Amino acid sequence: DESLSANGEGPTLFSVMDHCATAMGSREMRRWLREPLRSTEDTSARHDAVEAIMGDEPSREHFFAVLDALPDVERIASRVSLGTVRPRELASLRDTLPTLSALGASLADSPLDLIAGIGRSMTLNAEIWERLEQSLVSEPPGMLRDGDTIASSCSPELAELRHFRDDTSRILLEMEERERAATGINTLRVQYNKVSGFYIEVTKGAADQVPMHYQRRQTLKNCERFITPELKSIEDRALSSKERSAALEKELYDKLVAETAKHTPELLAAAKAAAQLDVLCAFARHAAENRWHRPKLSSRPGLDIRKGRHPVVETAIENYVPNDCRLEDGRRMLIVTGPNMGGKSTYMRSVALIVLLTWAGSFVPAAAAEIGPIDRMHTRIGASDDLAHGRSTFMVEMTEVADILRHAT
C-alpha cells in the first residue's frame, strides 16, 4: 500500500482504493491489501460478492448509508471487554445496532455464501441493545463522572437519591404543608441553612403547640427551631444524595458494562462482518467508477494481462497508455528496457499491483486479466549505497537480487 509513496507522502494504492464508510472497513481493507489470499475458492468468493454489489448500485448505496452511521464497533467492543467504555460509546451501540442487525438479517439469505455469512454475523441478539435502551438516558454525558448516565427508571433507589438531590426545596415545601395541617400551626416553616441544617421553625407563641416528637434544636429570640426523625432522615439523605447517587450510578454502570461484555464475541464478529461488507462495497464502487474488470483465476502458473493500467498513476493523468503482459511456462521472464522516465518501473509495478489486487479479492485496472497461483512477490526497484557496511550501490542491488532468486519458487 506504499505504491508511489514519496516518504509517506502522495497517493498510495490504499488511499485511492479506500472508499470505506467506516474506520473498521479501512483497517480491514489495509489488511486485505497487505495479506492477499492464496485460496482460489476464497478469492473467487470475494470476486463474486464484488460483482454482485457492483451490479446493484441502489443496494450498494444503502449499505454505505447504514455503515456510515456506525460507530467504531470493533474499538468500542474492545473497550467494553476491558471495562473502559464511555457512556456515549455505549449509547452509540444502542442507537445503531438495531439497524446493523436488520441489514444483516436482510443479507443472511443471499445466494452467495460470503454475503450470507456476513449477514449472519451481523444479525445480533436484540437483548444487547434492549438492555442498553432500558439502562441509559437518551443522551448520556461524555464521562461517567459527569452524572446522569443511568436512567432513573432502572433503580428506585437511584431515582429517590436523585429526587432528594434535585428537589430538596420542593420536598421541604411538601413537608411544611403536611406539618401545618397536622399541627394547625399556620406560621410553621420547614427550612435549611448551612449552619443549622434542616429544621422546623415556629414562633415563640406557638411553641407550646408542637407535638411531643418534635425535638428542640435551637432557641432564638422570636422563634424555636425543632427537628423530627422524618426531617433528620430527609437531611441525611439530601446532604449525602449527590455522593451516594454517583456511587450507585457507577455500580449500576459497571454492572451494565459487565453484562454487555458477555456479548463481546458477538459484537466483534458483527464488527468484522460489517468491515468486510464495507471493503466489498468500496471495491465495487471503485471498480464501477474506474472501469475495472473481474480477473479470471487460473490453476496454471503464469499471468495474462490485457490493457493493464497502474491503479494509482491512472488517477493522476488523463491519457494513460495501457500495456499487456504475458508470462507462462515458455515465457517466464521479461527484460524491460527503455530510457529514463520511460515508464519501466510503472509498467512493472502495474503488473505487480494487478496481481496483488486479484488475490486481495478486488477487480483490476485491465480490460482482461488471467492470473495463476502466486505464493509470493519480490521487488527490487531503486537502491543506494551502504557505505557504513562497505557496500556500493551495485553491491546492494546484487545482494537484493540474490535474495530474491534464493526465495523465488
Walk through the language-model features, giving the residues of each.
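Alpha-helical coupling/stalk and coiled-coil linker elements that connect catalytic or binding modules
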Residues: D1-G342, T346-H378, E400
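Switch/coupling sub-region of P-loop NTPases
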Residues: R376-T409
